[in-house]
C-alpha cells in the first residue's frame, strides 16, 4: 500500500491524485457493500470503519468476539449478522493490550462462538498480539498486514489508543484516523476498533475519541447495566443507519457471552431532550478560537490561571461567544490539549506551532 506521509509530491503526481479524486456526474459509483448488522440495522460497510467504546471492565472484548465470530461463521452471534463477500472472508484481529496467553483465550472464545474446532487454527482468521511493540512499530506492522493479506474483509483493532504516544495529540490522532480512511478505501475493508471511555463521563477518551466520533460510520457503547452488574448493554451512540434496539449480554459459567433475553431497553426520557455537553471542538470553529486568542493575548502573556480564564472570556465574547466559568475551564482544557496555548514556567502563551 502506498504511504504518502511527509513526502513531497511533484506537480504531475498531484495532478494524478486530483484526477483520481474527481467525481463525475456521468460515472457510476457503487454503494458500499453492507457487511455487518445488528439485527436489521447496518453498522458496517466495506470502505468504512466503526468502533466500540466503553469503560474498563464493561466487556468490550467479549462484544467484539461476537462480531468476529459472526463474520467468521457467517451466522448470527448475539445480535450480530455478517454478509461478507466470498473474496472478503479473511479477518485480521489486532490486540495491543494483552499478552499472548490472554490473546489465545480470546481466539478460543471466538472459535467456540463460531462453532469451530479449537484444536486447529482457522483458515480465515489471523490474530496478532502487538503489546510488546512501540506505537510506531505497531502501526507499521498493521499497515504491512493490511496491505498484504489476500481476501481481507474485516480488521479488528483492540485498541486504537496504543497506536499513539499521546492520546490528546491532535496531530497523532488525525494521522491515525487518516490511516483508517486510507486503509479502508484502498483495500475496501471494514475496520472495527475499540477505545476506552473517560472515567467521569460518556465520551471516548482523548482527541482520538473526538476524531472517531466525527469520522466513524458507527459508534457503539458497551456499558455495565446500572441495576445488574453481571449484564452489559450494547447501544448505538452515533450511527448513519437507523438506531438498533439496545441489547444485553452476560458472561455464562463457561466464560462465554450469551444474550439476556429478558432485557428491556430503558425508556427514553419524555419532555425536552437533555442538552448535549459543551464541546469547544464541535461548537466553536478554528478561526473563532484563533481570533479569540489573539484578543485574549493582545497585551502579551498571562501570568496566572484566573487572569487567563478572564481574558479568555473577554476574547471569546468579542467573537460573540459567551463563556461562563465552567465553559471557560472547558475551553482552557481544550486549548491545552490542542497545544494552542502552552504554559511556560508560570506564564500562559500562544503556541504558534500548534496543529488543529
Q: Model-predicted segments: where are they?
A:
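C-terminal regions of RecA-like/P-loop NTPase motor modules
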Residues: 4-10, 148-149, 226-356
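The Walker A/P-loop phosphate-binding site
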Residues: 5-110, 352-354
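Conserved catalytic network of the ASCE P-loop NTPase/AAA+ motor domain
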Residues: 44, 83-86, 118-120, 147-149, ...
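Phosphate-binding/switch region of NTP-binding enzymes
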Residues: 51-53, 57, 62, 171-259
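Alpha-helical scaffold elements adjacent to nucleotide-binding pockets in ATP/GTP-utilizing enzyme cores
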Residues: 66-67, 102-110, 141, 145, ...
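Conserved, well-folded catalytic cores of nucleic-acid-processing
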Residues: 70-75, 110-113, 163-166, 183, ...
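Conserved inter-motif catalytic segment of the P-loop NTP-binding fold
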Residues: 85-168
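Short beta-strand segments at enzyme active-site cores
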Residues: 155-158, 190-195, 341
